[in-house]
């Protein structure tokens, strides 16, 4: 009973914003999400490092929950799909914004993300029983993080990327990276507060 809904969160059960991402309706539901995570999760973990990857995953999961309680507070939603869509958004954004800075093989893998994202969005809108807000909330957070955050300095020598023509792109200082994560988290907290005011 760890689903997220506006009424439950308004009753003080804030933990549902995160717990819902670790529960699934049935075996097929969890298998599909884990398969999607298996496809591109390891590559994103390599790009951002284990700690940042975990932070991104949790923020995307929270993004799906927060948009759900904002837009459809009566909905009861569970599943990791918001986080999965967030990772898709992250991969799409970083592959577009940092295209030349990524290794060739990484570019090839991430180049397929656009098609995968389009297919999953089609399922989101046309298959009954799917939390549209959960998917879109996670996607929005992932797109923002992917656009603002270059891959972690741990991914390349001295936090730099060698690109075509020999140019070098410096990595983002850790303090700025932390500020981005805290800023997104703050927006999610603010969104939750607005949702609670609307329900009250």
Model-derived features with residue positions:
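Residue-level signature of the transmembrane alpha-helical core
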Residues: 18, 58-62, 83, 88, ...
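Residue-level signature of transmembrane alpha-helical entry/exit and packing/kink sites
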Residues: 16-17, 53, 108-116, 177-181
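A cytosolic-side transmembrane-helix exit/cap motif
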Residues: 75-76, 98-107, 153-165
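Multi-pass alpha-helical transmembrane bundles in non-GPCR membrane proteins
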Residues: 91-124
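C-terminal transmembrane module of polytopic alpha-helical membrane proteins
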Residues: 121-200
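N-terminal TM1-TM2 helical hairpin plus the immediately adjacent luminal interfacial "cap"
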Residues: 1-80, 125-133, 137
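Helix-boundary and loop/linker segments of multi-pass membrane transporters
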Residues: 6-12, 105-110, 170-173
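Membrane-interfacial alpha-helical segments at the cytosolic side of multi-pass membrane proteins
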Residues: 31-52, 58, 86-99, 140-153
């Amino acid at each position: 009973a760890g689903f997220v809904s506006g009424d439950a969160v308004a009753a003080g059960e804030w933990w549902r914003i995160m717990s819902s991402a670790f529960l699934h309706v049935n075996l097929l539901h969890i298998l599909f999400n884990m398969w999607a995570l298996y496809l591109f999760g390891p590559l994103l973990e390599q790009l951002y490092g284990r700690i940042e990857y975990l932070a991104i995953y949790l923020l995307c999961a929270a993004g799906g929950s927060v948009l759900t309680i904002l837009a459809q507070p009566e909905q009861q939603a569970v599943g990791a799909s918001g986080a999965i869509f967030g990772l898709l958004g992250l991969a799409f954004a970083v592959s577009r914004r940092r295209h030349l800075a990524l290794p060739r093989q990484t570019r090839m893998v991430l180049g397929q993300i656009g098609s995968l994202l389009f297919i999953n969005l089609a399922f989101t809108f046309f298959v009954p029983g799917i939390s549209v807000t959960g998917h879109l909330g996670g996607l929005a957070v992932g797109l923002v993080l992917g656009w603002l955050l270059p891959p972690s300095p741990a991914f390349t020598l001295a936090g730099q990327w060698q690109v075509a023509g020999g140019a070098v792109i410096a990595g983002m200082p850790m303090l700025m990276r932390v500020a981005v994560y805290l800023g997104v988290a703050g927006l999610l907290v603010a969104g939750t507060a607005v949702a609670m005011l609307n329900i009250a």
